[in-house]
Amino acid sequence: MVKIIDNSEVYNLIKNVTDQLGIEIIEINTFKKRDEGRIQIVLYKGNDFGVDTLCDLHKMILLSLEVVLKYNFSLEISTPGINRKIKSDREFKIFEGRKIKLMLDNDFEEGLILKAEADGFIFKTDTKEIRILYSDVKKAKLS
């Protein structure tokens, strides 16, 4: 499939719905092949985000997208998952207070995102609390 829909267009179409429900848009992937497409959306709202909420969101988002998109498409909505790889600085802010596995050198260290800032975040382990620059992070994932 070839990616042709602008992700920011999808973002703008669904942002109002997610904002009203206090839900963060983590990631959007859009693909189109001939007259069919696929839209994948990853959403997050702390611990109180169940299957019923996802089902309701799917219906609301589908209606918003069907008005604009003039071809058949499938819509997949999911949550980040237990071991999601953190892909951007913005996600550190979204996942504040969550446990992560962090690789700075060659080993993973487990700890908590205590506070995310503009250029880094405070990482708390059982033994220390340190400030880490996003540019120093080799890998990070939820744990």
From Swiss-Prot:
Does the keyword section mention Cytoplasm? yes
Q: What SUPFAM superfamilies is this protein classified in?
A: YhbC-like, N-terminal domain
Q: InterPro entries given for it?
A: Ribosome_maturation_RimP, RimP_N, RimP_N_sf
Keyword Cytoplasm among record annotations? yes
Task: State where it is primarily located.
Answer: cytoplasm
The signal sequence is none
Record's keyword terms, sorted: Cytoplasm, Ribosome biogenesis
Please provide, in alphabetical order, the Gene Ontology terms of the cellular component aspect for this entry.
Answer: cytosol
Any GO BP annotation: translation
Q: Which compartments is it annotated to reside in?
A: Cytoplasm
Query: What is the stated purpose of this protein?
Result: Required for maturation of 30S ribosomal subunits.
Q: Which family does it belong to?
A: Belongs to the RimP family.
The name under which this protein is listed is Ribosome maturation factor RimP
Report which gene this protein is encoded by. Answer: rimP
